[in-house]
């Protein structure tokens, strides 16, 4: 594993005043597919303003956990609470409107729409549901919010371009902008730097650090250097369970974690 960054580069979780209670909490979260237990009694808390990373070998349960939290999969047992409210088993659209947004491992945009339209539709769905046939200019501040989301991810100058014309790195950042437009409490990023060049990865790392000033972020990522440089805390999944949890420096020196990674 790479050397952890200094505390100066950490997210501002500790500076958000008294609001440090958990935004997300899972209690005994379990999911089974036939005889396979993909998640086994996961108890996890993510504090407000925190950047939490989930790492682990392939098949460890990382994506399954993401899919449970965002409503793609319904858990077999256990609970998921967002800001103390039970959202267990709710469909993705309701979970999104409750305050959880996500990006996907595979780029998920509307390629034949403009960059602004991609983000505007997301902002509109958060405020008014999927009322696509109403003229969007009747939605007051929707465009303003969409433009603010584009500015946050560095794409304001490309608002009128087709999304298909963006580079791969820009398309991944557009996905983050789409998520931001829904005004989430918790932003879930599923391998946000997958397929990126080193320069694009660095740009995305800086972007995540910027937007973390106002958000709680949950990230699944295989790039250990990126994880160690961004995360406040890391949860290590293995065989559907949490093997270890702690700040980056602690995880880097954890003998059980090192053993798992050396075996893979």
Per-range role (PLM):
Residues 2-264:
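Glycine-rich phosphate-binding loops of nucleotide-dependent enzymes
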């Amino acid at each position: 594993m790479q050397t952890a960054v200094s505390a100066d580069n950490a997210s501002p979780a500790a500076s958000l005043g008294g609001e440090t209670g958990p935004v997300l909490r899972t209690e005994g979260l379990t999911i089974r597919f036939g005889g396979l237990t993909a998640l086994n009694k996961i108890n996890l808390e993510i504090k407000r303003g925190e950047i939490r990373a989930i790492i682990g070998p392939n098949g460890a349960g990382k994506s399954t956990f993401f899919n449970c939290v965002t409503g793609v999969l319904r858990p077999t047992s256990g609970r998921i609470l967002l800001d103390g409210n039970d959202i267990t088993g709710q469909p993705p659209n309701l979970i999104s409107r409750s305050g959880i947004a996500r990006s996907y491992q595979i780029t998920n945009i509307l390629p034949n729409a403009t960059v602004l339209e991609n983000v505007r539709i997301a902002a509109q769905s958060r405020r008014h549901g999927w009322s696509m046939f109403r003229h969007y200019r009747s939605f007051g501040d929707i465009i303003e919010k969409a433009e603010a989301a584009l500015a946050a991810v560095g794409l304001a100058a490309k608002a009128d371009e087709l999304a298909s014309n963006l580079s791969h790195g820009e398309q991944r950042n557009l996905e983050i902008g789409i998520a931001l437009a829904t005004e989430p409490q918790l932003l879930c990023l599923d391998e946000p730097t997958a397929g990126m060049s080193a320069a694009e990865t660095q740009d995305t790392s800086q972007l995540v650090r910027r937007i973390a000033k106002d958000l709680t972020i949950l990230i699944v990522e295989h790039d250990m250097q990126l994880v160690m440089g961004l995360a406040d805390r890391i949860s290590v999944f293995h065989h559907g369970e949490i093997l270890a949890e702690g700040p980056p420096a602690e995880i880097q020196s954890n003998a059980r974690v090192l053993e798992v990674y050396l075996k893979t």
